[in-house]
Every structure is written in C-alpha cells, then in structure tokens.
Amino acid sequence: ELYEAIPADTLIDDVEIPMRIATRGFRVLYDFDSQAHDSQSLEPAREKIRKQRTLAGNYQMLFRHPGWLFPWRNRLWWQLISHKYLRLAAPFLLITLMASNLILIGEPLYQALLWFHGGFYALALLGGLFPPFRMALFSIPAGFLFLNLMSLRGLYYYLFKSAKSGWDSTTTQPAQKN
C-alpha cells in the first residue's frame, strides 16, 4: 500500500522504491525470511556492465532526487550519502589529488606523496592486467581502480546514453524462490 510507481527507466529500483517510502516518513522493514541473490559474474565483461549500470543508477537517483541529500527532507540522508554518493565522488577526488601532487611537486612531501600515488596505480595496473597477480597486494588496488573507472563510465552512460544501453542484462540464471 506504500508502493508508488517509479519511472520505467529507473536503473536501481531496489533502492529507489524503499527510499521513496522512507522519505514520506515511513520505516522500511524487510522480512527476515526474504532472500536475495546477486552472484558476481566470473566474466569480466559482464561484471563491467553490472557495475557501470549500478553506478549509473546512483547518478540517476542523485540527479532525480537532489532533495534526498538534506536531513530535513530525508532521515536516511547520511546512509544514502555514505553508501551511495561518496562512491561517486571518489574518482573526482582522486583526479584532484593527482593534480595537487603534480602542481606542488617542488615540495618534498608532495614528491613523496606522488611516488606513493604512482606506486598504488602501478600495483593496480599489474593486478588488473596480469591474472597471476591476484594476491591482495595487487588485487585490492586493482579492484579500487576498477570501481572508480566504472563510476566514471556510469556517469558517461547516465549523461549520454539511453537508459536501455546501461541496462543490458547480466543475469546468468533465474532467481530461485525458496
């Protein structure tokens, strides 16, 4: 009875529907017996599509519902910002950090930070390009870099592609009802 229709092109309806209910002042509760299965694809191409689509959906929600950012309009504002929107800011913060390091390269502290920054990206590239480097030293930076690249791609798809182009199915098997 609290459900209200959402636009047909909504990319992350599993977030938007409960958020619409919560912003109307209701509590959202989930049945303890309910189950959801979202298996990670072992195929990198499918995982890229899935991540890109989810992050495009976060941008879509941010631009459709800017009022949700304010505590007087959304009692879940901090959860939304910390779990969804800070992830969208990360690539821009990383670009700003690199630019700051390059601008201030004459200072010894910023030279050291630039070396650490560059080393992190080198580890990420090794972890992403060479499957034998799947140990945490390489895979964690690679995963972090991958997520931030998908965030930028998600923004691109949200701004320049139709909703359908960001919503190619990645389902490999139908969900089972228990």
Where does each model-flagged region fall?
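Conserved nucleotide-sugar donor-binding
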Residues: 1-5
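Membrane-proximal intrinsically disordered regions of secretory-pathway and membrane-system proteins
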Residues: 166-178
